[in-house]
């Protein structure tokens, strides 16, 4: 779906000639994607709709994950014959024709474990494989074992996995890191991109693009060999995110690519489908019905695209923070996504150079530099003093401060003076007793106040350290770790999200109950423990008093971006 081009001529920035060569070469690879498995709402048609609307299961994900016991077409034919017969029992029909997902076994940790020991003991508990995937299973097979987040999440998730892998590396499980990188490379080769998760109903979208950072992490252990090995898959993923760019005119958008009126190229989140999400079917239908002034398909697309962002859901995407039906994800250009795209371009340049292709390395550097200028020009709110998303409807940078504003610092794309202002804004507006707030808005959505999420704590900590802001970075790590420790001391588990307005409380809001496990919290906790404690005296629990910043080992970045006025 393209947006119309402006009616009057616009000045266009000079786009590097290499960009069209890069995308032309890679688009061929993207077009080789085979026929993909159909999601259950398509396979089962009216049966899927009727089961979900009947609310047979408390969690809509249950039936989306159910495995048909025979050909779905035959099951659907039987359903059509039986559904209007006297005494027909839909629940019985489902029980006969489907194998429902099993409840995960409750993990009871040994008594007396430290926080670190608990996490190290969880890695095998959270490890899964898809060796025995059934023919009509929505679960997509992967060649190697993988670590799932935990709780209701029985599959691997894209951006979760990077932060889980940080912890695996910290625990010395480089074999598991290598397995997960291989799995994601397999998905790119098989489907043309990394889906939201390894389910057929997730194939229409991706998630925040961390694959290049995963390869870079693996290269810490394997050297440049990892960069060279996975260069083709990184290029294919880049082609997926930039698909359609070669035909865009100024002021247009196509799928995940946005070309602004001066020719600046940026990215947005997008889902190729505009129907209710199978895993949240009833909720999405209700959201669309609650706003009759918008086409339902438009709302469905924006709900799905918010899921692609990983922030499902947040006031960040909404016009009215208390009405989910006002979200418009596809008309917002996210600062975190474009920071990750900048990082992908930088890693592609490094990998190309390692592979001996200096010309291609220079082309990726040119693309990264152009994107960096775009971030500085369009995603810095000078009046507020922080990075923010760009609004395609108002043609202005938005005013809301969110934890996503730390991503330019995380990838070393921020100008030094702006990083300093971000440190002040973070400490003033987002830092809470239990860690970093996701936003300052209390909307009831899970990616808003008072919730704090492990990946955003790490992005902020690492980003601030990159620019020498070690005190604020330590404050974030210390506050969040204290929250994690207090919750663990009371409940003997780590959870998906935390209430950062206090310490020792799991977060609330969202479409499902609080989940424990939990992959990315485990990973970030291990990284932060090793950050705040000296290498000579590693800690297995969070110290009782705040450490000094000298234990933080990351050196400040000397890089300064060149802001475009």
Curated annotation (Swiss-Prot):
Compartments where located: Periplasm
Top enzyme class: hydrolase
Chain residue ranges for the region called Disordered: 538-565
Taxonomic superkingdom: Bacteria
GO terms, biological process: cellular hyperosmotic response; trehalose catabolic process
Keyword tags: Glycosidase, Hydrolase, Periplasm, Signal
A Pfam family of this chain: Trehalase
A Gene Ontology cellular-component term: periplasmic space
rRNA processing found in the keyword field: no
Its biological purpose: Provides the cells with the ability to utilize trehalose at high osmolarity by splitting it into glucose molecules that can subsequently be taken up by the phosphotransferase-mediated uptake system.
Quaternary structure and interacting proteins, as annotated: Monomer.
Family in the record: Belongs to the glycosyl hydrolase 37 family.
Name this protein carries in UniProt: Periplasmic trehalase
Organism name: Escherichia coli (strain SE11)
